Every structure is written in C-alpha cells, then in structure tokens.
C-alpha cells in the first residue's frame, strides 16, 4: 500500500517499485528477526497494479485464500509503536514468533501463549475452521 493510502490519502507520487521493494524488505526483515523462522523458507509472488486496485486485490486474496496471518496470527505487518503504545498487548505474531527487538519491549503479554496460538493454527490448517474465541 502506498504511504498515506490507509488514512484516506491517495498515496500518489512515490515510485511504485520503490514502495513495493521497501514493503517487501520490511516483511523480510520481520521474518529474519524472529528466532524460530528462516527467511529461506519463504517465497514471494507479487503483481504491480495501479494504486486504486490494491485494496480490492488484497481483499479478494484474503477472502479467497484465508491466510492464517490474517485470521489467527495478527501483527506481522506491525511497526514499532513507540514508547507511548508499549503498554498494549503483544500481537499474536510476536508471541508465536518472538525476536523483533521493538516487540520485545511491549509490556503486556498476549492473552494466549505461543503454544495456544500454534494449536489454533494447526486446527485451522487441518479443518479450515477458525477456532472460537
């Protein structure tokens, strides 16, 4: 997503190749910082489209493929929230995949343990059903 587009801006003006490269690099960094994932186990496919189509494409992909990180393990795309928001609960992503330095400073633990989150992921992958909260 182009900068500003999630807040109602058009995100126009930035080179789309630079924006995409930066975002994919951020994602690679998030994976690389974990203590229990290896970046070489991941592959990436992407399609460059006009900014107007990004939200529609993203929504269709999420609805079609129902990826676990959108349904159960939220927090992969998060950035450092800064000191003012460190009292918030640690994301499921950072609970299951610890290691991002800024996330280690988050004060409140997730209400679920890494083991509980992992069990829900296995259940979802085996059954296609999102566990009840």
Residue spans of the language-model regions?
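Boundary/linker segments flanking structured domains
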Residues: 2-133
């Amino acid at each position: 997503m182009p900068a500003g587009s999630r807040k109602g801006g058009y995100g126009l003006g930035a080179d789309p190749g630079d924006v995409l490269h930066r975002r994919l690099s951020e994602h690679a960094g998030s994976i690389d910082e974990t203590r229990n994932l290896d970046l070489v186990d991941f592959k990436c496919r992407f399609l460059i489209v006009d900014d107007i189509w990004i939200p529609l494409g993203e929504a269709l992909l999420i609805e079609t493929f129902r990826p676990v990180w959108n349904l159960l393990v939220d927090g992969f795309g998060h950035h450092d929230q800064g000191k003012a928001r460190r009292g918030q609960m640690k994301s499921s992503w950072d609970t299951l995949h610890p290691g991002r330095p800024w996330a280690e400073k988050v004060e409140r633990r997730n209400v679920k343990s890494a083991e509980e989150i992992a069990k829900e992921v296995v259940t979802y992958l085996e059954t296609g059903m999102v566990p009840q909260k």
